[in-house]
Amino acid sequence: MILILLGPPGIGKGTQASVLSDILKINHIATGDIFRKNFKENTELGILIKKIIAQGLLVPDDITNQMIADYLSKDIATKDFLLDGFPRNVLQARFLDDFFKNSHLFLTKVIYFNAGTQDLMKRIVGRRICPECGKVYHIENIPPKTPGICDKDQKTLIQREDDKPETFLKRLKVFNQETLPLVQYYREQNQLFEVDGMQNIDQVTKMILEVLETDRK
């Protein structure tokens, strides 16, 4: 089984990726983790990407594609995984199609988590994180027992720069320009399943598992 998760920033892809990978017993492959691994190990690609980022430039598709391909080639033995954070545009999707074809792999489903801008904004700006343990709260939906304080280690909660309204809107603009066209790309391939990402976690998971089970029949 191979799944791809798509959705705007703040929709909860990472949370669903963790839940689904545990239930389905498949690997959760997050692009951010692959980048950090290459940085930490000072690989040739990792060093190159660091230089590009240091110049304030975007990492070219061909370099990102190569990093993903290298990782998947080493981890291909299981042939069961979930991609979170890749592809980000149609060119990357076409590269991935070719990679799957050459590796005799078959994409099971693309899950697209949809939501309106205002709903996303409300979710994002209310998010708070513990700088010590990383636990995520929301001032309305998942509040700590004591306002502004982590339940676990009593540290003062913070709001990430990415979660501030002006930063979020910039990230959303990039998503709409680059990643949103992927929805139509995969819809035309009859591989897309769209789900309301603003439902609670259990509801979203249930809907995804149901459509995957239907596809198996």
Curated annotation (Swiss-Prot):
Gene3D superfamilies named in the record: P-loop containing nucleotide triphosphate hydrolases (3.40.50.300)
EC number: 2.7.4.3
Pathway(s) served: Purine metabolism; AMP biosynthesis via salvage pathway; AMP from ADP: step 1/1
UniProt-annotated stretches for the region NMP: 30-59
Binding residues for ATP: G10, I11, G12, K13, G14, T15, R127, V136, Y137, Q199
Single GO cellular component term: cytoplasm
Subcellular location: Cytoplasm
InterPro entries in the record: Adenyl_kin_sub (IPR006259), Adenylat/UMP-CMP_kin (IPR000850), Adenylat_kinase_CS (IPR033690), Adenylate_kinase_lid-dom (IPR007862), P-loop_NTPase (IPR027417)
Entry's Gene Ontology molecular function annotations: adenylate kinase activity; ATP binding; zinc ion binding
Coiled-coil stretches noted in the UniProt entry, renumbered to this chain: none
UniProt-annotated stretches for the region LID: 126-163
Catalytic reactions on record: AMP + ATP = 2 ADP
Positions annotated to bind Zn(2+): C130, C133, C150, D153
Pfam families (UniProt xref): ADK, ADK_lid
SUPFAM superfamilies (alphabetical): P-loop containing nucleoside triphosphate hydrolases (SSF52540)
Record keyword Kinase present: yes
Keywords assigned: ATP-binding, Cytoplasm, Kinase, Metal-binding, Nucleotide biosynthesis, Nucleotide-binding, Transferase, Zinc
Residues reported in the UniProt entry to bind AMP: T31, R36, L57, L58, V59, G85, F86, P87, R88, Q92, R160, R171
Record carries keyword S-adenosyl-L-methionine: no
Assembly, per entry: Monomer.
HAMAP family, alphabetized: Adenylate_kinase_Adk
Described function: Catalyzes the reversible transfer of the terminal phosphate group between ATP and AMP. Plays an important role in cellular energy homeostasis and in adenine nucleotide metabolism.
Family to which this protein belongs: Belongs to the adenylate kinase family.
Domain notes: Consists of three domains, a large central CORE domain and two small peripheral domains, NMPbind and LID, which undergo movements during catalysis. The LID domain closes over the site of phosphoryl transfer upon ATP binding. Assembling and dissambling the active center during each catalytic cycle provides an effective means to prevent ATP hydrolysis. Some bacteria have evolved a zinc-coordinating structure that stabilizes the LID domain.
Protein name as it appears in the record: Adenylate kinase
Organism: Onion yellows phytoplasma (strain OY-M)
